[in-house]
From Swiss-Prot:
Probable secreted lin-12/Notch ligand or co-ligand involved in the mediation of Notch signaling. Involved in the lin-12/Notch pathway signaling of cell fate in vulval precursor cells (VPCs), acting redundantly with dsl-1 and lag-2. Required for normal octanol avoidance response, acting via both lin-12/Notch and glp-1/Notch signaling pathways in neurons, in concert with lag-2. Involved in regulation of sleep-like quiescence during the larval to adult transition, acting via Notch receptor activation and in parallel with EGF signaling. It comes from Caenorhabditis elegans. One of its GO terms (molecular function) is Notch binding. May interact with lin-12/Notch receptor. The keyword Signal applies. Residues 1-18 form the signal peptide. InterPro entries: Notch_signaling_modulators. The keyword Iron-sulfur does not apply. Keywords: Cell membrane, Developmental protein, Membrane, Notch signaling pathway, Signal. GO terms for cellular component: apical part of cell; apical plasma membrane; extracellular space. GO terms for biological process: cell fate specification; Notch signaling pathway; positive regulation of Notch signaling pathway; regulation of gene expression; response to osmotic stress; vulval development. This is Notch ligand osm-11. It is found in: Apical cell membrane.
Length: 189
């Protein structure tokens, strides 16, 4: 063996030994990230996630899947995803301070007559998280991509374009969307 071969082998051995430390450091950083943001995940993505402000919706839609990927949520049993069998979808909260915030709220079950609900036949209601709603594109064919989920996904854009509609053709399109997505009501002008 000549000097160059010995030097090359020494460099390879040093690099091979340095790599596990880097992996350990990344795992430690990942663990710290998971611990640090667990409360945020439970607040915005977990079973008890409340309504999400529209300003945060985009960030939450990216955060929830990233946290689940890096922190092995569901596999390790940290947080179980909600039951997707229920058709009820809670859309994002409208911006506060808006004069029209209460005019485009989803129709709630409380508005239905009391005799329709019975304790024996009432379906179990579950909210879809922002991360799940973000995946419900119009082309989605997954089991959780119900019409209600797709409506909740497209509602912010529809609300922006339809209030007020820019033309008669757009008004007709908006009317068709609101008739399909009955959980939302259009702003009345």
């Amino acid at each position: 063996m000549n000097f160059i071969t010995v030097a090359a082998l020494a460099i390879v051995m040093v690099l091979a030994q340095a790599n596990p430390a880097r992996v350990r450091r990344n795992e430690e950083m990942s663990e710290r990230y998971c611990i640090k943001h667990l409360d945020h995940y439970n607040k915005y993505c977990g079973d008890n996630a409340g309504p999400i402000d529209r300003a945060l919706f985009g960030k939450v839609a990216k955060f929830c899947p990233a946290y689940e990927k890096h922190c092995a949520v569901g596999k390790a049993g940290l947080v179980e995803l909600p039951d997707l069998g229920s058709p009820l979808v809670m859309p994002p909260v409208l911006p506060r301070g808006s004069d029209f915030a209460s005019l485009d709220l989803p129709i709630a079950d409380e508005r239905k007559p009391a005799h329709i609900h019975s304790s024996r036949t009432a379906p179990q209601t579950t909210r879809l998280t922002a991360a799940i709603v973000a995946t419900c594109t119009p082309e989605c064919t997954a089991a959780h991509c119900t019409d209600e989920c797709k409506c909740a996904h497209t509602h912010p854009k529809v609300h922006q374009m339809c209030n007020p509609p820019s033309s008669a053709a757009m008004a007709e399109t908006c009317q068709r969307w609101y008739s399909k997505c009955t959980m939302f009501t259009p702003v009345q002008y």
